[in-house]
Regions:
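Rossmann-like adenosine-cofactor binding region
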Residues: 54-58, 172-241
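Structural detector of well-ordered beta-strand residues that form the stable sheet scaffold
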Residues: 4, 67-70, 90-92, 130, ...
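Structural/interface elements that position substrates and couple domains in central-metabolism enzymes
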Residues: 2-7, 12, 22-26, 99-101, ...
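An N-terminal-biased, well-structured beta-alpha scaffold segment characteristic
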Residues: 1-92, 194, 214, 220
């Protein structure tokens, strides 16, 4: 099998293929769209990250020998999964690859926001002492709303509980009577918007989650609510924010 790699993979990742002599790997980083169209049928599989878009236009030209699209990442929003499925092409991703990293980054952003860390750092770097300008908020006892309790959402919820926050969550694929093995209240989406002091989003980008955070949902939220999005950008309507 010949595999095309169009985006950056670590040396360790590429070395995994060396164990299989029947696999030939061709790394072509930053392959532009027209070049991809001209060479893609020389391979039976492609591995991408975020830069390469495997949309219906590309997938439609794939011949019958093409077997697999692999994305080295969590989401597959840059792959037209429906078009691939119609041609019998397998689409794979790595849903747990960056779960811990993303959960930790979410909490890092949370502390930065409530403690005004970037602003205070910039002030100190400018050789100023403006201590009273950067008073923060205490997180203990605050209501922390998680939208999406998948691999990442659960890890974030665990960390929020460790800080002493009350955690509420919504996930349409988890029933309210599910035992989560942690003290998280499963509630309707509207309750998350209304009750949370902090809202964090951990969903894929789909037609159902695009602009999930927009004018309608924002109007339900508390004044001064903190919104953290470590998922896909399209989930939050930035103009409405």
């Amino acid at each position: 099998m010949k595999i095309l790699v169009t985006d950056g993979l670590s040396k360790e990742g590429l070395e995994l293929f060396a164990k299989y002599p029947e696999i030939e790997v061709d790394v072509r980083k930053k392959t532009d769209r027209e070049e991809l169209k001209s060479i893609i049928n020389n391979y039976q599989a492609v591995i991408i990250r975020s830069a390469t878009k495997m949309d219906s236009e590309i997938i439609d030209i794939l011949d019958d020998n093409f077997k697999l699209i692999g994305r080295a990442g969590i989401g597959v929003d840059n792959v037209d999964v429906s078009a691939a499925s119609k041609k019998g092409i397998i689409v794979m991703n790595t849903p747990s690859a960056n779960a811990i990293t993303t959960a930790e980054h979410t909490i890092a952003l949370l502390f930065s926001l409530v403690r005004n860390i970037p602003q205070a750092f910039a002030s100190m770097k400018a050789k100023k002492w403006e201590r009273s300008s950067f008073q923060g908020k205490e997180l203990y006892g605050k209501t922390f709303g998680v939208i999406g309790l998948g691999n990442i959402g659960r890890l974030v919820a665990e960390r929020a509980l460790g800080i002493g926050m009350k955690v509420i969550a919504h996930d349409p694929f988890i029933s309210k009577d599910t035992n989560l093995n942690m003290p998280v209240d499963l509630v309707d989406m509207e309750e998350v918007f209304k009750d949370a002091d902090i809202i964090t989003v951990h969903t894929p980008l789909t037609s159902g989650t695009k602009n999930l955070i927009s004018k309608g949902s924002i109007n339900l939220m508390k004044d001064g609510v903190i919104i953290i999005n470590c998922a896909r950008g399209g989930i939050v309507n930035e103009e409405d924010i």
